[in-house]
């Protein structure tokens, strides 16, 4: 009988990261997915990254994950979103060639040390004494294991809706999984339904681009991965069009036929990625909504019209599309649809992503209530790392709100749960100025090195980068000019007769890297590796970062203050019954987690801290 230490079920974005991370830690790992072409499948939009999401990708890369490197082998339209705003909200994004992305992912995974791939369907999991024993395939065969990572995406009792038509499926033309849903219910997990959707696909050869707006990418693509020196994939343009009043009229007239508005769908959809029906109803005063026409590949004429996700009947979809400028004669290749699926309340998992009910069972991705490739991949890498570390009897690996967006996401999910598809935003992070895309490796790679999940190649690149940062920082502190000379160059500084270094100049409003290079041409040599830009940001926002680091230190001290599992909140007399009930229900593990529970007052936190000092001052009962 086959036996593996870790088995990952599902080969989507969470699954591939989980399997690769486990394998990198030297643990024999099996990835089970339905077919080869499912590996890294982009079920919805053909793009990676975006605002906050791009930072997640960079963090995955910092831990030697796959997503950043793979998109650099397949990215056909790179764009830094929000670049006119502050660096805390910059969002690296790349349009992908679907075929190139899957090809690169397949080539990497099929040659990955310690990783085997099995193409098949898991029907059930075997548990004994609340511990994982094996997976059972639909052909009845059994594979023994110590740990299982479930990354089921939209396959748990998946149901596609197109108008009034219902199609049981986890994805178009792929069967859903009822067996695993039933098993999870039998175990006692709390399951609910969520919904997501996708737009129709259209034929780019039938679009009149003269009626659309050109959207070029960045002149020089900035890679996601620290392993990528330069993006060698050909770059192409995207285009923008918009809905019209006629589009809106057709949608309003047919709302009763929409699966969402007819009451046919039970699941809640993503608040921040609404269907076109939702947009028309919720934003009824808007006369138009933008649509991004995104090519699905270099040699693929399929276009993804980002912005018109729908569950309307096919004939209505055809009508509304033809009211959009440039799409009057367009050919629809595949209808849009909504898909409903089961997920588990993420408060049933710990911050390691191991379930609280079953030892050795981990969840990652949409099963935890998230939406998005990047959110799934971020969970996958953490689940894979922790499953492998548990096999090796090593301490778990936990990221926090203070050091990563991945940590913010996991803390949000495990503390508050979610009743709608969870998506990452910069606004979810209290420390977003410190948690930028450009410093992801400086925050996380050393942590990955400490547990052995980072390859030797990446270690060398990271070590060299750290050395270069110190060298360039020293240079920036050495190069200087007097205030009088700077004034003659038109740079406004206080005329105090002192010398100003480049780092001093970076703090001046409106002074930028390009100006520094003009004044000190030798800096041009440092520009290629983005270190100069990094140091510019650190200098520009130094005072804010100093204050934020103080906040982070306070946060970390509260996170380190554990709350005993057996604490009885009803014995703390100075807090209200409502708060006592809330704390008893949530069972926070630290003071930091307790503080983040909605409705918990600062006075209640103070009361808990005082109670812990008096009741548990001898260190008993943790």
Swiss-Prot record:
Isomerase as UniProt keyword: no
Alphabetized UniProt keyword annotations: Cytoplasm, FAD, Flavoprotein, NAD, tRNA processing
Positions contributing to FAD binding: 10-15, 122, 177, 366
Biological processes annotated in GO: tRNA methylation; tRNA wobble uridine modification
Residues that, per the record, bind NAD(+): 269-283
Pfam short name (any one): GIDA
Localization, UniProt: Cytoplasm
Keyword Flavoprotein in record: yes
Function: NAD-binding protein involved in the addition of a carboxymethylaminomethyl (cmnm) group at the wobble position (U34) of certain tRNAs, forming tRNA-cmnm(5)s(2)U34.
The protein's name in its UniProt record: tRNA uridine 5-carboxymethylaminomethyl modification enzyme MnmG
Gene (UniProt): mnmG
């Amino acid at each position: 009988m086959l036996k593996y230490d870790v088995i990952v079920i599902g080969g989507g974005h969470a699954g591939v990261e989980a399997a690769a991370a486990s394998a990198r830690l030297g643990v024999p790992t099996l990835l089970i997915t339905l077919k080869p072409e499912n590996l890294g499948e982009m079920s919805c939009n053909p793009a990676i990254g975006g605002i906050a999401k791009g930072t997640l990708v960079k963090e995955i890369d910092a831990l030697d994950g796959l997503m950043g490197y793979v998109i650099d082998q397949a990215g056909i339209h790179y764009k830094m979103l929000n670049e006119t705003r502050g660096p805390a909200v910059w969002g690296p994004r790349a349009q992908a060639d679907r075929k190139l992305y899957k090809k690169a992912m397949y080539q990497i995974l099929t040659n990955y040390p310690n990783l085997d791939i099995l193409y098949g369907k898991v029907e059930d999991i075997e548990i004994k004494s609340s511990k994982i024993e094996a997976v059972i395939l639909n052909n009845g065969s059994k594979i023994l294991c110590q740990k299982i990572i479930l990354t089921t995406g939209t396959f748990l009792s998946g149901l596609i809706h197109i108008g009034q038509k219902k199609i049981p499926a986890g994805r178009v033309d792929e069967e859903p999984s009822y067996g695993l849903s039933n098993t999870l219910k039998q175990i006692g997990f709390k399951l609910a339904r969520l919904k997501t959707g996708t737009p129709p696909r259209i034929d780019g050869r039938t679009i009149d681009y003269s009626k659309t707006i050109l959207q070029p990418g960045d002149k020089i693509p900035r890679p996601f991965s620290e392993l990528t020196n330069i993006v060698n994939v050909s770059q192409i343009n995207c285009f923008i069009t918009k809905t019209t009043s006629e589009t809106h009229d057709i949608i309003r007239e047919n709302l009763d036929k929409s699966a969402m508005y007819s009451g046919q769908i039970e699941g809640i959809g993503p608040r921040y990625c609404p269907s076109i029906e939702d947009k028309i109803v919720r934003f009824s005063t808007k006369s138009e909504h933008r649509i991004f026409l995104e090519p699905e590949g270099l040699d693929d004429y399929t276009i993804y019209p980002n912005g018109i996700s729908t569950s309307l009947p096919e004939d209505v979809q055809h009508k509304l599309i033809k009211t959009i400028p440039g799409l009057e004669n367009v050919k629809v290749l595949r209808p849009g649809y909504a898909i409903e699926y089961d997920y588990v309340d993420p408060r049933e998992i710990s911050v390691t992503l191991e379930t609280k009910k079953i030892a050795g069972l981990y969840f990652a991705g949409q099963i935890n209530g998230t939406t998005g490739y990047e959110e799934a991949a971020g969970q996958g890498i953490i689940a894979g790392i922790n499953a492998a570390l548990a096999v090796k009897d090593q301490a778990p690996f936990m990221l926090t709100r203070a050091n990563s967006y991945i940590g913010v996401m996991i803390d949000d999910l495990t503390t508050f749960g979610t009743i709608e598809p969870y998506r990452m935003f910069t606004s979810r992070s209290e420390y977003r100025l410190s948690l930028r895309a450009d410093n992801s490796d400086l925050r996380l790679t050393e942590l990955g090195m400490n547990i052995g999940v980072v390859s030797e190649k990446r270690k060398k690149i990271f070590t060299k980068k750290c050395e270069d940062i110190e060298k360039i920082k020293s240079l920036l502190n050495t190069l200087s000019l007097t205030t009088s000379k700077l004034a003659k160059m038109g740079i406004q500084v206080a005329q105090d007769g002192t010398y100003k270094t480049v780092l001093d100049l970076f703090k001046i409003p409106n002074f930028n890297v390009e100006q520094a290079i003009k004044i000190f041409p030798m800096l041009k040599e440092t520009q290629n590796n983005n270190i100069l830009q990094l140091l510019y940001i650190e200098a520009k926002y130094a005072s804010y970062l100093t204050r934020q680091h103080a906040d982070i230190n306070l946060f970390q001290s509260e996170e380190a203050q554990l709350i005993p599992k057996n604490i009885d909140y009803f014995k703390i007399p100075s807090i209200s019954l409502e708060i006592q009930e809330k704390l008893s229900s949530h069972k926070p593990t630290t003071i930091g987690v307790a503080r983040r529970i909605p409705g918990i007052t600062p006075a209640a936190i103070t009361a808990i801290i005082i109670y812990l000092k008096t009741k548990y001052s001898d260190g008993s009962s943790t």
